[in-house]
């Protein structure tokens, strides 16, 4: 079975270090959650069949627990824990003994059984201030000064109004002044933890999407969907949170006015790629980070999800940072090095960070921006529009990636344009 080590994608830097060492891509044995699994059911099952399957699982699990063989494993298990339903994809998490796992693997209703996994956050440190990223988004990829605070960012003044950006991350400081009351708490999957951002990553990502100063879509709403805390998570929580997001978008009739940002990455893990793909088929757009391993993104999840918008990082002078993943599955490049945004620790706190965690929300913000000014009826239309606006052949060392950088199209629009300084 393939294992996955997820991490949030901001990189550790020291001054002058532009080639940091990435976190390990593959998980070690200690990363597996003992006795805990993610089970994916086959498609086409009826509600009655799923109910019967759950009853069967409970019965088999109880019988195995009562046997000597199950007790000898030394792992206390609790059976089915949570169920996830994304479009027509049905999955559940559970704590099972080895015998029950064997029984599940042979069950005709089961597509796959994968061990659950701890998910780790990448370390971050504060950097000098920089504002080049926004100016880059409206400059057709023209190189911009790294440390300038007078870079123009031109945009339509609808600026994401009426659109909802869902940030699956460490939470968001919804009281930060950058959000002007447009950020709300949605779902917290972490038990016995408050729905606050103690790590900073989620607030940072949300600021790039929709902050009044640092955001691409300055009037968009942002929803905090907390699947990480201060250092680790598991698929049990990530899938629960992603499931909640898809349901909330669907129930709120926001499919054409919502985008999900996933600034996370790890080794290829099919169950989560399947979840992202099913959300796409349900009419929901997901933007994901390419990953920080300096390798081909085809080996990463969710970067390898075929219909996610996968984002690599580009520097201010149109070069690929050595950390950014690349490859044919990278759809687009966006600013991802020395990007300033909101941070933890106060309602006006900021930090400057690097990584594909910063690149992805630039494009998620662009999606929100375009949704507010154009009629984009489906994820396919969203992706086509974003890619149609890109500027080609600018990124140096893009390797075999599609070479196109993000652009908001403003120079082709006939509006009175506000400017950001």
UniProtKB/Swiss-Prot annotation:
Any one biological process term the GO annotation gives: proteolysis
Subcellular location(s) of the protein: Secreted
Domain Peptidase S8: 131-421
Active site residues per record: 169, 201, 357
Positions of the propeptide removed during maturation: 17-122
Record InterPro entries: PCSK9_ProteinaseK-like, Peptidase_S8/S53_dom, Peptidase_S8/S53_dom_sf, Peptidase_S8_Asp-AS, Peptidase_S8_His-AS, Peptidase_S8_Ser-AS, Peptidase_S8_subtilisin-like, Peptidase_S8_subtilisin-rel
Keywords: Glycoprotein, Hydrolase, Protease, Secreted, Serine protease, Signal, Virulence, Zymogen
Single Gene Ontology MF annotation: serine-type endopeptidase activity
Residues with glycosylation annotation: 248, 261, 348, 388
Position of the signal peptide: 1-16
Inhibitor I9 domain mapped to chain residues: 36-122
Hydrolase recorded as keyword: yes
Cellular component terms per the entry's GO annotation: extracellular region
Known EC number: 3.4.21.-
Coiled coil: none
Function: Secreted subtilisin-like serine protease with keratinolytic activity that contributes to pathogenicity.
Family of this protein: Belongs to the peptidase S8 family.
Protein name according to UniProt: Subtilisin-like protease 2
Organism: Trichophyton verrucosum (strain HKI 0517)
Gene from which the chain derives: SUB2
């Amino acid at each position: 079975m393939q294992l996955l080590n997820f991490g949030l994608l901001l990189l550790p830097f020291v001054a002058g270090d532009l080639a940091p060492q990435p976190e390990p891509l593959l998980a070690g044995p200690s990363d597996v959650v003992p006795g805990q699994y993610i089970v994916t059911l086959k498609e086409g099952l009826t509600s009655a069949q799923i109910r019967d399957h759950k009853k069967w699982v409970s019965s088999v699990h109880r019988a195995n627990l009562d046997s000597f063989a199950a007790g000898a494993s030394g792992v206390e298990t609790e059976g089915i824990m949570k169920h996830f339903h994304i479009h027509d994809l049905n999955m559940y998490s559970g704590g099972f003994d080895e015998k029950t796992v064997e029984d599940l693997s042979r069950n005709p209703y089961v597509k796959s059984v994968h061990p659950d996994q701890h998910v780790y956050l990448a370390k971050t440190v504060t950097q000098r201030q920089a504002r080049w990223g926004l100016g880059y988004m409206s400059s057709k990829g023209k190189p911009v000064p790294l440390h300038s605070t007078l870079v123009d960012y031109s945009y339509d003044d609808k600026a994401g109004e009426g659109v909802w950006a869902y940030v699956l991350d460490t939470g968001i400081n919804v009281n930060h002044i950058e959000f002007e009351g447009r950020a709300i708490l949605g779902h917290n999957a972490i038990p016995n933890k408050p729905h606050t951002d103690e790590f900073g990553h989620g607030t940072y990502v949300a600021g790039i999407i929709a902050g009044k100063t640092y955001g691409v879509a300055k009037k968009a709403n942002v929803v905090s969907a907390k699947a990480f805390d201060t250092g680790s998570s598991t698929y049990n929580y990530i899938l629960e949170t992603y499931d909640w997001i898809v349901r909330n978008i669907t129930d709120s009739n926001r499919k054409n006015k919502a985008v999900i940002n996933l600034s996370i990455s790890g080794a290829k893990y099919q169950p989560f790629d399947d979840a992202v793909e099913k959300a796409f088929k349900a009419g929901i757009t997901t933007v994901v980070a390419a990953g920080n391993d300096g390798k081909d993104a085809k080996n990463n999840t969710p970067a390898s999800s075929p219909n996610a918008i996968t984002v690599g990082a580009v520097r201010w002078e149109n070069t690929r940072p050595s950390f950014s993943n690349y490859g044919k599955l990278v759809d687009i490049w966006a600013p991802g090095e020395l990007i300033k945004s909101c941070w933890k620790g106060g309602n006006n706190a900021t930090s400057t960070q690097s990584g594909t965690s910063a690149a992805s929300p630039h494009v998620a913000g662009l999606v929100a921006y375009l949704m507010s000014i154009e009629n984009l009826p489906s994820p396919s239309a969203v992706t086509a529009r974003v890619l149609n606006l890109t500027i080609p052949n600018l990124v140096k060392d893009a390797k075999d990636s599609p070479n196109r950088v993000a652009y908001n199209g403003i120079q082709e629009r006939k509006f009175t344009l506000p400017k950001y300084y």
